[in-house]
């Protein structure tokens, strides 16, 4: 099986910037950890793919967090990614599933809802943050991220996201693309791009047919027009740790920690993103209190 990866490219002599990714393994890892049902898997997987692609636009140690909250039954979908191809995600209600929609597809819109927003927070280093948001206009997520780029980042873009789920709940295929029009692009280039996107098959179908990220970009933009700049590995990766959660406990304050010692004789923390559990003994919490008062 081909491992997940991202492709960055230019097209039409630099007038178009394009990114594509295969994310089947990463979405499968998240599905296994959270035991998501098919509709939730599709919504989470689409959000993960978009977040991963947006992360690949960052540099160095920059990272971003995306929160999708359409006020639907699934609750919030939260994903974060960095510039190195690492992504992780979770959903509030992982066991969300509905009958297929009228098109015979997983009903992501019904799960996500259409009465909320996409929020993006980019950590660009030096304690500097960029924050943007846009309303959810579709609930299918591809159109919603397209709208986010147009309104919040003023970048005309097309975002395609797809997840296919097997009858046993495992992930059959996942991936997507973000294609962006660069400033100064000719009208005829934009028209060609619009026509190509309007006539293409759904991205999940392209992946199911075995198309690689390069193949997806060639299919949309035309093989002669695509210039591959870089490929990078992608994976589900959680950076949680015993120490990070201990710092989070410290942030709760002395009174709360005293309660944990007296009433619970310790503490347990569970990472939302990966499900890992961290246990803290009474002695550890007492040492933490002592260090806070030192």
UniProtKB/Swiss-Prot annotation:
GO terms for cellular component: cytoplasm
Cytoplasm among keywords: yes
GO terms for MF: protein folding chaperone; unfolded protein binding
Record Gene3D superfamilies: Hsp33 domain, HSP33 redox switch-like
Disulfide pairings: 238-240, 271-274
Pfam families cross-referenced by the UniProt entry: HSP33
Chief place of localization: cytoplasm
Location in or out of the cell: Cytoplasm
Keywords attached to this entry: Chaperone, Cytoplasm, Disulfide bond, Redox-active center, Zinc
Description of post-translational modifications: Under oxidizing conditions two disulfide bonds are formed involving the reactive cysteines. Under reducing conditions zinc is bound to the reactive cysteines and the protein is inactive.
GO aspect biological process, one term: protein refolding
Tree of life domain: Bacteria
InterPro entries: Heat_shock_Hsp33, Heat_shock_Hsp33_C, Heat_shock_Hsp33_N
Function statement: Redox regulated molecular chaperone. Protects both thermally unfolding and oxidatively damaged proteins from irreversible aggregation. Plays an important role in the bacterial defense system toward oxidative stress.
PANTHER family in the record: 33 KDA CHAPERONIN
Stored NCBIfam families: PRK00114.1
Protein family membership: Belongs to the HSP33 family.
Name of the protein in its database record: 33 kDa chaperonin
Annotated organism of origin: Staphylococcus haemolyticus (strain JCSC1435)
UniProt lineage: Bacteria, Bacillati, Bacillota, Bacilli, Bacillales
């Amino acid at each position: 099986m081909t491992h997940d990866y991202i492709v960055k490219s230019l097209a039409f002599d630099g007038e178009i910037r394009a990114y594509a990714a295969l994310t089947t393994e990463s979405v499968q890892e998240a599905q296994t950890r959270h035991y998501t049902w098919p509709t939730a898997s599709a919504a989470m997987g689409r959000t993960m793919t978009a977040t991963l692609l947006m992360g690949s636009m960052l540099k160095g140690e920059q990272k971003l967090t995306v929160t999708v909250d359409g006020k639907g039954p699934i609750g919030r979908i939260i994903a974060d990614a960095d510039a190195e191809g690492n992504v992780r995600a979770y959903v509030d209600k992982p066991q969300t599933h509905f009958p297929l929609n009228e098109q015979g597809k997983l009903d992501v819109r019904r799960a996500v809802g259409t009465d909320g927003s996409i929020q993006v927070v980019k950590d660009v280093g030096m304690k500097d943050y960029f924050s943007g948001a846009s309303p959810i206009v579709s609930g299918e997520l591809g159109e919603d991220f397209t709208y986010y780029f147009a309104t919040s980042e003023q970048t005309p873009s097309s975002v395609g996201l797809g997840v296919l789920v097997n009858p046993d709940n495992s992930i059959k295929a996942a991936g997507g693309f973000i294609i962006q029009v660069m400033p100064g692009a000719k009208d005829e280039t934009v028209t060609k791009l619009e026509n190509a996107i309007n006539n293409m098959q759904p991205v999940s179908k392209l992946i199911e047919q075995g198309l690689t990220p390069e193949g997806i970009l060639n299919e949309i933009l035309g093989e002669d027009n695509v210039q591959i700049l870089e490929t990078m590995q992608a994976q589900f990766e959680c950076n949680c740790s015993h120490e990070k959660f201990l710092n989070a406990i410290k942030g709760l304050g002395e009174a709360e920690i005293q309660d944990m010692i007296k009433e619970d004789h310790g503490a347990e923390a569970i990472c939302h993103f990966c499900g890992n559990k961290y246990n803290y003994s009474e002695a550890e919490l007492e040492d933490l209190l002592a260090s806070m008062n030192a």
